[in-house]
Amino acid sequence: MIVISDSNIIFSCFYSPNGVLASILKEKKNRLQFIAPDFLLEEIEEHLPEILKNTKLTKKQAKALLKDFTQNITFFKLDDIPQRNIEKAQRIVESIDPDDYPFVALHLEKGHKIWTCDAKLSNGLKEKGYDMCVTTKEIKTKTYKKSY
């Protein structure tokens, strides 16, 4: 299964670097493949001062964690996504959160669901009739073996 990782998944990992989300992303023998638009890295960089302030991490520590969290993510350049998908994505999310268009555009291009904890995005897309998102609970059923 391939999923698109949303920025808020990475943000959450900074606040809980040993939590479930970080564990899923860092899993070495993962049955999941992660992809994301390169915009994710730009967004993290933009919010880095806020992350540093709230987590008390140093910039060096945060960069090391970011490397850990993104080591299993394949990044796609927005420039490589056809303009028609960019424009459609912008129309879809303009009333939800315009900053999320790169993730929706990648979904439109690749067809994989977006892994997000952003209820506003997930619910907003559902209200518009789009089934584009996957929950952490759904992700966990694909990555972790059942306990007997």
Model-predicted segments: where are they?
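Acidic, PIN/NYN-like endoribonuclease modules and their adjacent C-terminal/linker elements
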Residues: L108-K113, C117-Y148
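Alpha-helix capping/helix-boundary segments
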Residues: I9-I10, L40, F103, K120-L121
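Short, well-structured N-terminal submotif of metal-dependent ribonuclease cores
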Residues: M1-A36
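Residue-level signal for well-ordered alpha-helical positions
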Residues: P17, H47, E127-K128
